[in-house]
């Protein structure tokens, strides 16, 4: 069907249904079911729905801009793409399990919660902004930007084979970050603000040439790596670096209010300054190529260290 403007209460375009427009197009109504269907425009596409948008195994594509406003969006194994700016806003959940949301320009996503698990892909070639609540990026999920990436979320899960990454500056403000065997990195700079929440980086990687870690509570870096080419500081209530790596090519400053555990772990930098209430470095290595300072107010265990 060739169309330019479509305004009805309920739109059903399921199972190989096709809607195509050569011009700028507006789709408005209560709900849209594009499961297995195709909605394609050669210019801008604006979708405005009071209720749900279902794009399960469907295709929504614009050669111009793409704007979606809906109560909720389910794009499981579906695709939303635009050559221009892409803006998605949902009052409820945005589900992109195994799906693809991509823009050749800027990408802006606002939702109450976000499920990008099961190899879901969210990708912007220019500045990318994601604002959500609970964010599930496990099971191979990918949130990537070829430009800057700004992420604001509540609890973030970034599991095995999953990535949150950018070519330029990456800024993340979250209330908790659970990254078991996932990767969080930038080719330029990374600022991670936990807002006094927990950081779990078991078997994970956090890396950037310039790294800033803010407002950490407890940090679990067992078998993980937190590293930077430049100087960085890690301030936390407790830090477990057992079998983990904390590495800086310049200076590394650790300020741990209570317990620092680094059993068989590595802490290494050009200049290293460590302060904690308790330290267990059994089988671990604290290494500096220059100045080394270790201050412990309480018990020190350094068996085989």
Predicted regions and their residues:
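Hydrophobic lipid-interacting interfaces of membrane-associated proteins
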Residues: 9-11, 30-32, 50-52, 71-73, ...
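Short, T/G/N/S-enriched strand-turn elements that build extracellular solenoid repeat scaffolds
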Residues: 14-20, 34-40, 55-61, 75-81, ...
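Short stretches within intrinsically disordered, low-complexity N-terminal or propeptide regions
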Residues: 26, 72, 87, 105, ...
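Short, small-residue-biased leader/transition segments that mark boundaries at the very start
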Residues: 1-2
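Long, compositionally biased tandem-repeat segments
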Residues: 6, 27, 47, 68, ...
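Long, intrinsically disordered low-complexity repeat domains
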Residues: 125, 146, 195, 230, ...
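Transmembrane beta-barrel architecture of outer membranes
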Residues: 22-24, 42-44, 63-65, 83, ...
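Beta-strand-dominated lipid-handling architectures at cellular/organellar boundaries
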Residues: 150, 178, 191, 198, ...
